[in-house]
């Protein structure tokens, strides 16, 4: 779908005695090359805590090749402050194609390799947080839970917020 080879890392929780064949939820982590170790540590710590409801999770860290292309909903030359410089080349707009890759290619490949239980989380930060919200807005059935950390809502002069406002009234979340 993306016409390129994508790398990813996988963490599988340790199986305890008597839990052979146990399946786990899968947390898909965008910007995986930046956050893999901290998210694995977080899930290990909180899934072993008696005060947390987080179950042990498989973590699939999706590595980046072009964040702007993959995580943004529109092609834009607008800067963070909304201005457009005539020398800036428009970029981005590949979020829908990247969503197809996640669901139609990566998820199928992962589910053939790991003991997944069918529950899936999507986690993204910044541009990936924008992608996470875009996926929730346009394809809410794709994941069971969404975590968007500091999403880049400024992208293309706030186009996501404009689209999401329309979607809220058209969809049943």
What are these regions (language model features)?
Residues 1-173:
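Non-catalytic cap/lid and distal C-terminal segments of serine-dependent acyl enzymes
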């Amino acid at each position: 779908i993306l016409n390129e080879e994508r790398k990813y890392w996988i963490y599988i929780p340790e199986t305890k005695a008597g839990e052979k064949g146990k399946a786990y939820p899968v947390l898909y982590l965008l910007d995986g090359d930046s956050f893999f170790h901290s998210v694995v540590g977080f899930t290990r710590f909180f899934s072993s805590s008696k005060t947390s409801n987080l179950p042990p999770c498989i973590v699939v860290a999706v590595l980046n090749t072009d964040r702007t292309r993959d995580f943004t909903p529109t092609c834009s030359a607008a800067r963070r402050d909304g201005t457009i410089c005539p020398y800036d080349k428009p970029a981005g707009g590949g979020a829908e194609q990247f969503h197809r890759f996640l669901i139609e290619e990566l998820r199928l490949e992962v589910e053939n390799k790991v003991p997944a239980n069918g529950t899936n989380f999507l986690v993204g930060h910044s541009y990936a947080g924008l992608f996470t919200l875009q996926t929730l807005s346009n394809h809410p059935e794709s994941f069971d839970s969404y975590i968007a950390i500091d999403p880049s809502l400024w992208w293309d002069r706030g186009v996501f917020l404009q689209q999401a406002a329309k979607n809220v009234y058209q969809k049943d979340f």
